[in-house]
């Protein structure tokens, strides 16, 4: 549908300070899901050609934003949205002093989610994911990445990826899928991590690539996950089959996973609390984005902060995501992550907003088509009843989203 947006205060998130400051009242022309024209309405500023391009008579639908703020659609670039089971009881047990080792002995931890996810059908996984997705949509997202990683068998990982892709048919949202079979060691491979990695490389990755079920492959490279050599084997297999790579790296220790991810031109290295300057320099010398996950940091009551000042000094792009998952970040609100990134990690509101727009798009490989309001980019927007973009990081709980536009189609979240 061709759509004309009128009387919008634009926050384009283009490079520089100007991209963060709301514009005077402006118009945006959309055709075939793309932005085709941008204009302020200051008399005499627009060329005759621009005025013609933005003529309301040339559009099927016109929306008057009545001075509301128009931002790029927010992007959640790291989620574990699809899973079955509930681990609220573990949350309560931990707060009553039960150590994680004891919880795991009682059948809890990540393997409890694996069991529940294996038992669920694809349709059940979709149904369970929708309320979580609805929470993210209510926080202004138009795109989300969704990982597998709770199946840990060929059949169940594929089931998860299919469920994730099916979410696009249920809601107005763009879903990008990532294979995370190397998330944990399944019980069938206990004590045989190398054999499991071989299974991922020989069996799971080729089929996922052949059926186009994911665009990226991720690995939990950590002392309690998979080591550098195992991670590199997965990265090699992913590259061989034309898939991007990403890494869960330096969350609990400094293994060098971020540097490895950068060496393989990974889209992003995520968590990175224990990242050192060598790792930061590797990011600076690559196109790999540093993705911050403040929800997990908060929920786990971590104390090791990611190296924000080093990332700034080396001009490494920083993205922010919910990391929504049942064990360490049960948060379905991306704007809450903006607040956490500012209060816990001391990002500025501008850095935080760029982390869920321009830099989040880069973390998914869409840096040339999403995350910025610019001619030629996807017509994905979020519409807000706020005075300034900093309000998104500053306020928590107020429902300020008016609507979203996905591929040029308007979705009301309270209406105009």
Swiss-Prot record:
SUPFAM superfamilies, per the entry: Composite domain of metallo-dependent hydrolases, Metallo-dependent hydrolases
Known EC number: 3.5.2.7
Bound cofactor: record note: Binds 1 zinc or iron ion per subunit.
Binding site for Fe(3+): 78, 80, 248, 323
Keywords: Cytoplasm, Histidine metabolism, Hydrolase, Iron, Metal-binding, Zinc
Record's subcellular location: Cytoplasm
Catalyses which reaction(s): 4-imidazolone-5-propanoate + H2O = N-formimidoyl-L-glutamate
Primary residence: cytoplasm
GO cellular component, one term: cytoplasm
Residues binding N-formimidoyl-L-glutamate, per UniProt: 150, 325, 327
Binding site for 4-imidazolone-5-propanoate: 87, 150, 183, 251, 328
Residues at which Zn(2+) binds: 78, 80, 248, 323
GO biological process: one example: L-histidine catabolic process to glutamate and formamide
Any GO MF annotation of the entry: iron ion binding
Family: Belongs to the metallo-dependent hydrolases superfamily. HutI family.
NCBIfam families recorded: hutI (TIGR01224)
Role noted for this protein: Catalyzes the hydrolytic cleavage of the carbon-nitrogen bond in imidazolone-5-propanoate to yield N-formimidoyl-L-glutamate. It is the third step in the universal histidine degradation pathway.
PANTHER family: IMIDAZOLONEPROPIONASE, IMIDAZOLONEPROPIONASE-RELATED
Protein name: Imidazolonepropionase
UniProt source species: Vibrio campbellii (strain ATCC BAA-1116)
Gene: hutI
